[in-house]
């Protein structure tokens, strides 16, 4: 594909078919090509301070610190039990530059977040995909739902 359209064509056609020389699509929490919902500003600030592109490990670390910072601020406490109670509260969420606030699944403690679908050089889409509905939050269309698992957070 000569790096000119292999990132885009396979995933943006009416009827997807094999494209020789195309790129591999993979899910990730962050990618340097993500620019929506303030992502470009976050990328720019990170690049200015660190002299490199942000990776998903950098992003996940930032989200973790942001979650604890917000939980401490909202609970007005440094007690670990109060912080955890705040984080696991159904109303707790954090803006994370992905268009939808991230939150935790109460039943298994998993972080609910939009997932970026990327090639090595391009953002193709952000999941959950349009049309998938859930009675509680469309972010629960990603992963295993509460009714489909015996896993419980203790």
Predicted segment positions?
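Extracytosolic ligand-binding ectodomains
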Residues: 1-154
């Amino acid at each position: 594909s000569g790096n000119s359209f292999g990132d885009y064509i396979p995933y943006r056609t009416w009827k997807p078919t094999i494209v020789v020389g195309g790129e591999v699509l993979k899910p990730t929490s962050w990618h340097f090509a993500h620019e929506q919902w303030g992502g470009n500003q976050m990328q720019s600030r990170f690049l200015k301070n660190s002299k490199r592109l942000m990776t998903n490990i950098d992003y996940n670390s930032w989200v973790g610190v942001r979650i604890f910072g917000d939980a401490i601020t909202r609970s007005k406490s440094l007690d670990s039990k109060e912080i955890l109670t705040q984080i696991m509260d159904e109303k707790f969420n954090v803006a994370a530059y992905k268009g939808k606030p991230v939150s935790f699944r109460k039943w298994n403690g998993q972080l609910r977040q939009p997932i970026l679908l990327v090639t090595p050089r391009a953002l193709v889409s952000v999941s959950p995909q349009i049309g998938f509905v859930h009675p509680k939050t469309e972010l629960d269309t990603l992963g295993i739902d509460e009714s489909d698992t015996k896993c419980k957070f203790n």
